[in-house]
Amino acid sequence: MSTRKKKADAEVAQAATVAASPDIDVEELEGIGRVTGAKLKEKGYYTVRDVAYASVKELAEIVGSEERAQQIVEAARKMLGLHSFISALEVYERRKKIRRISTGVRALDELLGGGIETRAVTEVVGEFGSGKTQLCHQLAVMVQLPEDRGGLGAKAIYIDTENTFRPERIMQIAKARGLDPDQALNNIFYARAYSADHQMVLVEQAKSLIRQHNVALLVVDSVIAHFRAEFPGRENLAERQQKLNKHIADLLRLADAYDVAVVVTNQVMAQPDVFFGNPLRPAGGNILAHGATYRLWLRKSKENIRIAKIFDSPYHPEGEVSFRITEEGLVD
């Protein structure tokens, strides 16, 4: 066997080992000593995976130079097998390992190809009262169910920006699904975000919770509220979008790095120049449009019936289904 082949096989074996143990300490990375390791951990980069998914610019502020940061990021990505091209077949094999959380609504699960995916950001858009927060509450319960019942046997993180989280609703849904209501609440890590900056800090802090606990769902309800309130007017639009872009990028990295399903809700805004068709469009512009992996639009129908439409997806066809909001949660 050639030296080159042996080296390649060794790299593959090392990447497989690290992939099976993603929480390997950052100080185990080649070229990282205790001092640099301590600096990285102080800023929230505890593992090789944390560093591999970080941006060079962020690390440069910690280690002192972009050149040094580039070396560290490349070493981490090489260790994880993220440093080169792979075949489309390997991508397919990896996607077969994607996990899904049932919404608890059979028709909606079918529309989504089995439920809410991990390693992706799913955006839920709709007017006030369309059922966005109700769906988030239900997902925070559903993720706790065992896999044979549509869940992942895991916990959830819930970042609330508009004070709409209700423990009482969680208890109702949990009881209807055969879970102990108090235990269901105990399996949800909750935080109220009071500003856009606070919201972004909470996402950073969520990484630590995910590492320490069996978390498979992160909810941000709503992702846009603070950004719209703090950056009003066209004169602040560029700054708002730049900040929102970083926030969405952080959520995408978190979803992929930790095999977590990220669900964000989004508000709608009117288009006064539209005279035909739907005059509403999602807030957040192209930043959210390009940042979310899957986009779901909820709207009211008669009484307690809601309509869910998938309107943007890499592979799902457009389609819509109806569901009902009851005391027991969302049902067909």
From Swiss-Prot:
Listed SMART domains: AAA (SM00382)
Molecular function per GO: ATP binding; ATP hydrolysis activity; ATP-dependent DNA damage sensor activity; damaged DNA binding
Domain of life: Archaea
Claim: DNA-binding is one of the keywords in the record: yes
GO terms of biological process kind: DNA recombination; DNA repair
UniProt entry keywords in alphabetical sequence: ATP-binding, DNA damage, DNA recombination, DNA-binding, Nucleotide-binding
CDD domains from the UniProt entry: archRadA
Residues noted as binding ATP in the record, renumbered to the chain: G126, E127, F128, G129, S130, G131, K132, T133
One Pfam family here: HHH_5
PROSITE patterns per the UniProt record, alphabetical: RECA_2, RECA_3
Annotated family: Belongs to the eukaryotic RecA-like protein family.
NCBIfam families (UniProt xref): PRK04301.1, recomb_radA
Physiological role: Involved in DNA repair and in homologous recombination. Binds and assemble on single-stranded DNA to form a nucleoprotein filament. Hydrolyzes ATP in a ssDNA-dependent manner and promotes DNA strand exchange between homologous DNA molecules.
Stated name of the protein: DNA repair and recombination protein RadA
Gene encoding the protein: radA
